[in-house]
């Protein structure tokens, strides 16, 4: 996908995921990218901040880790409807935020709680191949 292609320029991308709305299956305006190294993550932050992706200007930064472990960097981006959004980067599996909401993703090897504003949804990333999205009633799916 375009997210993977745009960021693979900066290093090995382990996973890229665009978060979809549960009801409409349309993009919620943000996603996550996980790199194999922190160096690749930092290069992508510098190279992509303020750039256009799929017709939207994105903001790129490192997201806050919640008890994250060491390891590869990653992140998420938000294009947002109406030009909003943010790009969250995670270091060692922290989390990301995007759109007008906020929220934290899980780290590698576990779930880190959090929510995405405006509708009570939550997003939790899992191990490298995992990750999931769901609403606040605790029903999660990949």
Swiss-Prot record:
Signal peptide: none annotated. It comes from Sorghum bicolor (Sorghum). The keyword Lipid metabolism does not apply. It comes from the Eukaryota. Residues 1-65 form the RRM domain. One of its GO terms (molecular function) is RNA binding. Transmembrane segments: none annotated. This is Glycine-rich RNA-binding protein 1. Residues 48-101 are annotated as: Disordered.
